[in-house]
């Protein structure tokens, strides 16, 4: 499971795959291209993606894919072994604890379906209650 959290819209964007390889992450970047990449005739919003130093984020293929997006996508690298600094980790924790806990999935297709359903519900809740789980900036 890979995801991005849109702080402006408070929306979680998720992609699931059976593998966790650079090609899967690059596919996710293409999804972000479609959602946030520059569009003709529109003002470009700044987009920042925060990445840990996992192998799928640091491979040659991924670095090349990130370089082609450098004109609209800024990368912030987290220090190694510091998941507490990654805000999406809290979202994953909430997703697992409140939507996926105490369930058994017979195969990955059912798990994928449950994840996407949980994300839809979480996004709807965050849209209806914008102050829920909102971090207060220091």
Question: What role is predicted for each listed range?
Answer:
Residues 1-44:
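Electropositive, glycine- and tryptophan-enriched low-complexity nucleic-acid-binding patches
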Residues 3-4, 10, 29, 52, ...:
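Generic structural signal for small/hydrophobic residues in well-ordered secondary structure
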Residues 12, 58-59:
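Conserved protein kinase catalytic core
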Residues 41-57, 81, 86:
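Acidic/histidine-rich, metal-coordinating catalytic segments
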Residues 62-64:
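Distinct, well-ordered alpha-helical segments
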Residues 67-87, 104:
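RNase H-like polynucleotidyl transferase catalytic core
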Residues 88-138:
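C-terminal anion-handling pockets and recognition modules
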């Amino acid at each position: 499971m890979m995801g991005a959290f849109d702080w402006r819209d408070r929306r979680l964007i998720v992609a699931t795959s059976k593998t966790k390889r650079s090609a899967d992450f690059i596919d996710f970047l293409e999804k972000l291209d479609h959602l946030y990449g520059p569009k003709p005739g529109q003002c470009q919003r700044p987009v920042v993606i925060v990445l840990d130093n996992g192998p799928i984020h640091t491979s040659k293929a991924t670095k090349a894919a990130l370089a082609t997006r450098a004109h609209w996508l800024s990368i912030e690298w987290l220090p190694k072994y510091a998941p507490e600094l990654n805000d999406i980790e809290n979202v994953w924790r909430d997703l697992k604890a409140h939507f996926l806990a105490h369930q058994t999935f017979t195969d990955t297709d059912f798990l994928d379906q449950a994840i996407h359903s949980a994300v839809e519900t979480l996004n709807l809740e965050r849209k209806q209650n914008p102050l829920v789980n909102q971090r207060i900036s220091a």
